[in-house]
Design a protein with these regions (language model features):
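Conserved long alpha-helical elements within nucleotide-processing catalytic cores of c-di-GMP signaling
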Residues: 1-24, 28, 35-36
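Catalytic core of nucleotidyl cyclases, primarily class III adenylyl/guanylyl cyclases
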Residues: 26-58, 70-112, 159-162
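Cytosolic regulatory/linker segments at or just downstream of nucleotide-handling modules
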Residues: 90-94, 107, 116, 121-165
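Conserved NTP-handling cores and scaffolds of large molecular machines
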Residues: 4-7, 27, 67-77, 120-127, ...
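Helical mechanochemical/support elements of P-loop NTPase systems and associated helical scaffolds
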Residues: 12, 19, 38, 55, ...
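Nucleotide phosphate-binding site architecture
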Residues: 1, 13, 43-44, 93-94, ...
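Structural preference for long, well-ordered alpha-helical segments in enzyme cores
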Residues: 19-22, 26, 59-69, 112-119, ...
């Protein structure tokens, strides 16, 4: 049963506030920025405005930290949150809203956010799934388990995916 059916609106907002605050804090701590909230989804990016060699590793670290933090949130009795996270690496175009200047704009354009969203659909609960390019750039600090190749909607060739463990 979904949270919207199990919780009254005030409790639901408290859970969402805790979840989104945790995501915001963790992404920021790892050098990233949250671009958009999409329902219970969070779109974050690393390497804006200045790309660093550590961006892919920081993104994977943040994803693992979010997955782990959800189990530690103080939620109403009987409520637990599970995550499915996709991480992809590549070029994007950032669309900032005029005057904001903080990097949270109307969105990002490019193959990379679509890849991350599609990889999320491959993930099982509490799994961080990364694209091969991300794995290659963030190879040292993590252990990966090959998940295989997948035909992802919108991508002409199969995509190789890995679980960050």
């Amino acid at each position: 049963m979904t949270l919207t059916l199990r919780l009254d609106p005030e409790e639901l907002m408290q859970v969402f506030d805790l979840y989104l605050a945790a995501c915001d804090d963790i992404v920021s701590e790892h050098g990233g920025r949250v671009m958009q909230y999409m329902g219970d989804g969070v779109l974050a990016y690393f390497g804006y405005k200045q790309a660093q060699a550590s961006d892919a590793a920081n993104a994977v670290r943040a994803a693992i930290a979010i997955r782990d933090a959800l189990g530690r949130l103080l939620l109403p009795a009987g409520i637990s949150l599970r995550s499915r996270i996709g991480v992809a690496t590549g070029l994007v175009v950032v669309n900032e809203r005029a005057g904001r200047g903080d990097g949270r704009g109307n969105g990002i354009v490019g193959e990379t956010p679509h890849m991350a969203a599609r990889l999320q659909t491959v993930a099982k609960p509490d799994m961080v799934v990364v694209a091969d390019a991300t794995r290659c750039l963030a190879e040292g600090p993590f252990t990966y388990r090959a998940l295989g190749t997948f035909r992802l909607s919108g991508f002409p060739t199969p995509v190789t995916a890995f679980e960050a463990v």
